[in-house]
């Protein structure tokens, strides 16, 4: 082969003959992969979808960074804990964080304090 690559058009034709369809997903800004502990954010992502025998495979290329998940506590939950226990917003928020968002546990902890 002497270091020469294959003609892209010929490569595409061969893949089509083998039942492989490849297409690029346009205008992708970022891709987020959510795991139990963190999110992997891939910015400036180029996404290619390869379909082989009905199964799709996604190839993602870009600038990846891992972002730890933070516990998001809804304002309604904070308000409910405040109303039930008579504590400040900050105390209610801290109790919910300490209980991993469990309303009952936060209320019991504040009530018994």
UniProtKB/Swiss-Prot annotation:
Protein name: Nascent polypeptide-associated complex protein
Protein family per UniProt: Belongs to the NAC-alpha family.
InterPro entries: NAC-like_UBA, NAC_A/B_dom_sf, NAC_arc, Nas_poly-pep-assoc_cplx_dom, UBA-like_sf
Sequence ranges assigned to domain NAC-A/B in this UniProt record: 5-73
Domain of life: Archaea
Function, as annotated: Contacts the emerging nascent chain on the ribosome.
UniProt-listed Pfam families: NAC, UBA_HYPK
GO BP field: protein transport
Sample GO molecular function, one term: RNA binding
SUPFAM superfamilies for the chain: UBA-like (SSF46934)
Self-association and partners: Homodimer. Interacts with the ribosome. Binds ribosomal RNA.
The keyword Membrane is annotated on this UniProt entry: no
UniProt organism field: Methanosarcina acetivorans (strain ATCC 35395 / DSM 2834 / JCM 12185 / C2A)
Alphabetically ordered keywords of this record: Protein transport, RNA-binding, Transport
HAMAP family linked to this entry: NAC_arch
